[in-house]
């Protein structure tokens, strides 16, 4: 096998760069400097030797083979939200250059390349009145979201993003191209639905589509000081048997106040009784109710979480209905944030997410949760980071009686993998050992293979 030093030789690098149909930026070039930190979270060390923007799957194969043969650190980036999509003196594959989308209206499926954002996909599928359940922010990368599970506004009514994945194209650590479906390789697609970044470079996904056009949205804003009572009422109601899967609630504790978004995936007539019930909780200072396009819903908080800042976050799961004690802990913690540059976000789960699936269908471990909660902070300066990390740890500790697990798409990466992958951990270790014994794909929420 070639050494890292040998692959640093100009001739070998030149030959590789010339073989790529896409674009390659070398460390030290002006283009490299302009592109190396084009990412959502810049609180990372990212110093690759090469940045490769592939034009096609053959470029991906060449990048994998070159990195493996030269023993280079290898990482993949797409939407640039991932905390782990970085490498040191290795090869960074920026797959955001691959954005083709093909909708099959008759079969209600879509084949989408991994470089697409959620917004890219929504824009195309909405032309047909169709869509998939995805996340909360349109500039999130579709690839990373899907491979970690995929939680968002429509999870209760349509399941996780990865639940709607029916196939994909993968380049493995040997540089081989595989078409992966339940029929062709059931154990591998099981692993991809929740831990997929560990097993290869996914170059495209095939999803089943659902009729998705407009949603009935109620937005209610409460002052921090008076929000405990309406949130307690909401917590009790949202977890009751009266609430259908089509209704979900997103709660955001922000500097502007406590924002409740009650989302009904259906018609105004169907959703009105549920949204009006939530509107009756407390006295909101803002109350807006209307039908809006789903694509608009997915963009509502885009400007609150822009690219190019330093972020820190954790994302555990809540195992029961929101109650007064839990809400008091959350509100008190928000008020004690050291820099006030934070938001606490709760996504309503249950519904389709909780419906039983076969153990070999998906490696997502936290289906029995009521909510996912994210403690998200902007880091104003490097000096603030220790206090922000301590604040996050403290609020997480206080919520431990109600919380479990962590979400691979929002974890800080310091937790044991058992916290992320739960009951699936041992099986995933076995599959990692089988499909990536060298741990070539390690810049992720990493599952280490068994070493002989």
Curated annotation (Swiss-Prot):
Residues in FAD-binding PCMH-type domain copies: 44-212
Modified residues (Pros-8alpha-FAD histidine): 81
Record-linked SUPFAM superfamilies: FAD-binding/transporter-associated domain-like
Family label: Belongs to the oxygen-dependent FAD-linked oxidoreductase family.
Keyword annotations: FAD, Flavoprotein, Oxidoreductase
Phylogenetic classification of the source organism: Eukaryota, Amoebozoa, Evosea, Eumycetozoa, Dictyostelia
Any one Gene Ontology molecular-function term assigned to this protein's record: FAD binding
Cofactor: FAD
Pfam families referenced in this protein's UniProt entry, alphabetically: BBE, FAD_binding_4
InterPro entries: BBE, FAD-bd_PCMH, FAD-bd_PCMH-like_sf, FAD-bd_PCMH_sub1, FAD-bd_PCMH_sub2, FAD-linked_Oxidoreductase, Oxid_FAD_bind_N
Claim: Secreted is one of the keywords in the record: no
Species assigned in the record: Dictyostelium discoideum
Protein name: FAD-linked oxidoreductase DDB_G0289697
Enzyme Commission designation: 1.-.-.-
